[in-house]
Design a protein with these regions (language model features):
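Structural preference for solvent-exposed beta-strand-turn elements
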Residues: 1-372
Length: 372
């Protein structure tokens, strides 16, 4: 194998694929990236057995071929080479090394046989559709914060993607919850997604797709089956196993009859919660909301350091109510509100609260209260 490639393109592509590779691997080949040269292109592939990323870039191959090299070392070498450099990659099968040349710099990396590199065979994909990159990014950005990190509740360690609604108003819905808060985003169901199975996309996969979308303004191709999902974003193809579990019946925790409505300026509310929570302890993080007609008083009391209160003018016309929330969770949800006004629908101090964007009907959030 002998191939010439521009440093900027190689660095960008390696930046995408090497993130999949774990720093420590008990299986040596999983620490490597598969490099394959073919006439006018170079492809890079990395996997952790659950997730596989392949990217293709322009190159000039004098000799076609393929090999595998340590992913993070390869990335670091390319990153430190001078900008604008033309990089020559040349494999020496007899010595099991890959030579890397750029200007006066010379490196050799030990290789492992390509035949040992695992292939995450996707099999037949039953559904295929496309989303605008901005829509895919919104689905992820507005739900990712609520993904559970508890490994014992593995079925909550991702975003539940499924079709919902009625035939006349069918939606593609993304839901995430950690048991304390829930996020739900709806988009118009794209062609090809009708009848799709409900799938749980793992947290790591979600993060990689999010980063890839930030580099691309085009469309995202999505193919899925019961066991795997594939995202095509520009020259990158990401294939992932799905979480093998049953997502809970989240509809049961979404309040339907909360009769107390609080309407508040999103920026003022977010800033006030942030200010008063400065004094809260890391362990407690509770902020109290005292509601009365036209007024909201936010307060935090920390026995070790003191207290804080702030008053806001709001739209509220129901009976007085005191309720507590985890301040970090409250700030996370407030950050998702895209418009200028947030609407909180409450019932009592022990029941979940529904949070919505006044200007956007496609998103809703649920937050469980805390005792204060």
């Amino acid at each position: 194998m002998k191939v010439t490639v521009e440093r900027a393109q190689l660095l960008k592509s390696l930046g995408h694929v090497h993130r999949v590779v774990e720093r420590r691997n008990t299986i040596p080949i999983l620490g490597n990236v598969l490099v394959r040269a073919e006439s006018t292109r170079l492809s890079l592939k990395a996997t952790d057995l659950d997730l596989e990323v392949t990217e293709t870039l322009a190159a000039e191959a004098a000799t076609a071929g393929s090999t595998t090299v340590p992913a993070h070392m390869f990335y670091d070498i390319v990153r430190k080479l001078p900008e604008g450099a033309q990089i020559v990659l040349e494999g020496d099968g007899d010595r099991s090394v890959l030579a890397i040349r750029a200007g006066r710099s010379r490196f050799t990396l030990q290789t492992l046989p390509e035949n040992d590199f695992p292939d995450l065979a996707a099999g037949e994909m039953t559904h295929s559709f496309t989303l605008a990159a901005a829509d895919m990014k919104r689905l992820i950005d507005r739900t990712q914060f609520a993904i559970s990190t508890e490994e014992t509740r593995y079925y909550l360690n991702g975003i539940y993607l499924h079709s919902a609604g009625t035939a006349k108003a069918a939606t593609l819905r993304a839901v995430a919850t950690d048991g304390h808060r829930l996020a739900q985003i709806d988009l118009t169901l794209p062609k090809g997604a009708v009848g799709m199975p409900g799938v749980i996309v793992p947290r790591k996969t979600v993060g990689e797709v999010q980063r890839l979308i930030e580099d691309n303004e085009a469309e995202v191709g999505i193919e899925l089956s019961q066991g795997k999902i594939r995202f095509t974003i520009g020259n990158v193809v990401l294939t992932s196993k799905l979480i093998d579990g049953t997502f809970p019946d989240y509809g049961r925790v979404i309040p339907q009859n909360n009769d107390k409505e609080l309407i508040v300026d999103k920026k003022d509310f977010e800033a006030a919660v942030d200010r008063v929570s400065t004094i809260s302890s890391e362990r407690g993080r509770a902020v109290k909301l005292a509601l009365s007609p036209g007024k909201l008083v936010l307060s935090v009391t920390n026995p070790d350091s003191g207290s804080a209160t702030e008053e806001l003018e709001v739209e509220y016309a129901s009976d007085p109510l005191d309720i507590g929330f985890n301040s970090r969770y409250l700030l996370d949800i407030a950050a998702q509100i895209e418009g200028e006004v947030a609407v909180l629908k409450l019932a009592d101090p022990g029941s979940p609260t529904l949070v919505q964007d006044k200007d956007s009907k496609g998103a809703l959030y649920v937050l469980m209260p805390m005792r204060v």
